[in-house]
């Protein structure tokens, strides 16, 4: 009888532990997309040297408040350099970045990263090929 009670108690404890799930933060990052429409560059493109472009991003909060937007550029596959680092807030942010392509042939990767209060980061990039 004692073995049966021990077995039954052990089974009940395991069932209770298996039934309890720890709630976890889904860590949903902010949403960000490139602005489309007349006058905006919203995807990879081939451009002439020293061309002036406008890249726009639309950012929406998911769970946590937005805190920062970083714009960086990487030339010819090298490491990136920060062009602009902005403090942002609110549930919806739209940002336009005027870009002047280099006067020499090569590639430019423009990288936009948004961070929320929990440290969730969303990154979008596009590549300009200067010819």
Give, region by region, the residue ranges found by the protein language model:
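Bacterial Sec-dependent N-terminal signal peptides
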Residues: 2-5, 10-38
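First exposed extracellular module after export/assembly in secreted or surface-exposed proteins
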Residues: 28-131
